[in-house]
Amino acid sequence: MSQATSMRKRHRFNSRMTRIVLLISFIFFFGRFIYSSVGAWQHHQSKKEAQQSTLSVESPVQR
C-alpha cells in the first residue's frame, strides 16, 4: 500500500511540475510574440513614412 501511495504522490508532483513548465513556456512564447509584434509594427510604420516621403519628393518632378 505504501508503494501505491508514494506513486500517487509522485504522479501528482510530476503533473504539477508539467503544468508549471508549460505555464512558463507559454509566458515566454507570449512575451516573444508581443516583442516581435511591436518591432514589426515599428518597422512597418518607418517603412510607410519613408515611402510617403519619397512619394512627396517625386510628385513635383512628375508635373
From Swiss-Prot:
This is Protein YfgG. It comes from Escherichia coli (strain K12). The chain crosses the membrane at residues 20-40. GO terms for biological process: stress response to metal ion; stress response to nickel ion. InterPro entries: YfgG. The lineage of its organism: Bacteria, Pseudomonadati, Pseudomonadota, Gammaproteobacteria, Enterobacterales. Induction: By heat shock (shift from 30 to 45 degrees Celsius) (at protein level). Its main location: membrane. One of its GO terms (cellular component) is plasma membrane. It is found in: Cell inner membrane. Keywords: Cell inner membrane, Cell membrane, Membrane, Stress response, Transmembrane, Transmembrane helix. It is a single-pass membrane protein.
